[in-house]
Regions:
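Short internal beta-strands
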Residues: 1-3, 23, 137-138, 157-166
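Short, charged/polar "capping" segments at the starts of alpha-helices
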Residues: 5-10, 27-30, 144-146, 168-173
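Phosphate-binding loop of NTP-binding sites
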Residues: 1-3, 7-16, 76, 199-202
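Hydrophobic/aromatic beta-strand patches that form the interior of the parallel beta-sheet core
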Residues: 18-20, 135, 162, 188
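A short helix-to-beta-strand connector/capping loop
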Residues: 7, 15-18, 107-109, 157, ...
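C-terminal helical cap/extension that packs against the catalytic core
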Residues: 148-208
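Nucleotide phosphate-binding/pyrophosphate-handling subdomain across enzymes
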Residues: 53-159, 173
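Extended acidic/charged loop-beta regions that coordinate divalent cations
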Residues: 9-55, 96-99, 103
Length: 212
């Protein structure tokens, strides 16, 4: 169970067998599980704390993916899979298609496909995964979702945003309702994805990340 997620952690009283947990912070003395400290992933089992691997060995972007690795490692520990096997698997895993998938580097900019992020919360997690200047492509089908929180993050964190598809008008409205930030330089509206990609290519500079 995730120690740092209230919905998950509230289920601990329902556990019939051995409880293992994961989270960014070290577990309490009476708990076993994985955690992150000083750039390293650890597994605590009783009085033993074992180093799994350094954070820099994880190829996946974003803190949410660190949580995913911590969860995978604690499941592996429950199955008594050796630490060296955990380490090897994580180091070789570069992600799945359409989920913060690195597409290519082009003229010094890096292009990522996160098109599986069809909800604003997932798009926000993707934005938080990068420190580089961002060009963000937002759009697709209109699922009547709330865009306000993402719009606020875009103004704070994104350099250029390009909207397209059915949901473009709602995204534009949400962006217009937010107090402008200092980071966002431009907002463009394109009819379709291909046009949006072309617009992003014109804006891209070396060191930028283009995120769909």
């Amino acid at each position: 169970l995730n120690r740092e997620d209230p919905g998950s952690w509230n289920l601990r009283s329902e556990v019939k067998g051995r409880l293992l947990s994961f989270g960014m912070q070290p577990p309490a003395s009476d708990l076993d599980g994985t955690f992150c400290q000083n750039g390293q992933l650890y597994l605590k089992l009783g009085s033993n704390t074992l180093a799994i691997m350094p954070l820099e060995s994880i190829k996946l972007r974003g803190e949410h993916n660190i949580h995913n690795v911590l969860a995978a490692c604690v499941i592996a520990a429950a199955l008594e899979i050796p630490l060296e096997v955990m380490r090897s698997c994580v180091e070789r895993f570069s992600g799945v298609p359409h989920r913060l998938e690195f597409v290519r580097e082009w003229r010094g900019s890096q292009w990522y496909n996160d098109s599986i992020a069809t909800a604003p919360e997932r798009a926000m997690a993707a934005v938080h995964s990068f420190q580089e200047p961002l060009i963000l492509l937002l759009g697709g089908r209109d699922k009547n979702l709330p865009w306000q929180d993402l719009a606020e993050l875009v103004h704070r964190r994104v350099k250029h945003v390009i909207v397209f598809g059915e949901s473009a008008s709602k995204i534009l409205a949400a962006l217009g309702d937010v107090q402008p930030g200092e980071t966002l330089q431009s907002i463009q509206h394109c009819g379709a994805l291909q046009e949006a990609v072309q617009a992003a290519a014109k804006l891209a500079r070396g060191g930028d990340v283009i995120l769909l």
